[in-house]
């Protein structure tokens, strides 16, 4: 999704109180990309400060989740201006505080590998 500052990121956000990782992932994709998805498996759990810049003064675990699209379509909203799909060779300018090229490549690899094993720091 295209952020308000013009950079791009995977849909995501903080897990809300009383939400599981699964339900929160599905909610965030709906809010930011307009898609109804089914979260099907965890790709990775990463320490944000080991993979993203700038570092935070506190620790955050980032959970990457593989989803299947069920329905829906994008509508501009308060968080995102646009939604699009990109191949690895055509990535736009990324919101590196949210996800970087290494993380996008990891997600592509997990999508294509039915035997993917969860990565974690």
Regions found by a protein language model. Give the residues of each.
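Hydrophobic pocket-lining residues within nucleotide cofactor-binding pockets
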Residues: 15, 69-70, 80, 91
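Nudix hydrolase/Nudix homology domain
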Residues: 7-8, 78-121
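The catalytic Nudix box helix
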Residues: 10-44, 65
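Active-site-adjacent beta-strand/loop module that shapes the phosphate/pyrophosphate-binding cleft
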Residues: 46-73
């Amino acid at each position: 999704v295209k952020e308000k500052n013009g950079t791009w990121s995977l849909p995501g956000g903080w897990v809300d109180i009383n939400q599981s990782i699964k339900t929160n992932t599905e909610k965030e994709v709906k809010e930011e990309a307009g898609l109804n998805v089914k979260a099907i498996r965890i790709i990775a759990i990463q320490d944000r400060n080991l993979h993203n810049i700038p570092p935070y003064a506190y620790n955050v675990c980032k959970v990457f989740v593989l989803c299947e699209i069920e329905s829906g379509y994008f509508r501009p909203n308060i968080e995102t201006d646009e939604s699009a799909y990109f191949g690895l060779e055509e990535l736009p300018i990324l919101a590196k505080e949210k996800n970087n090229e290494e993380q996008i490549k990891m997600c592509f690899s997990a999508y294509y590998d039915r035997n993917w094993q969860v990565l974690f720091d």
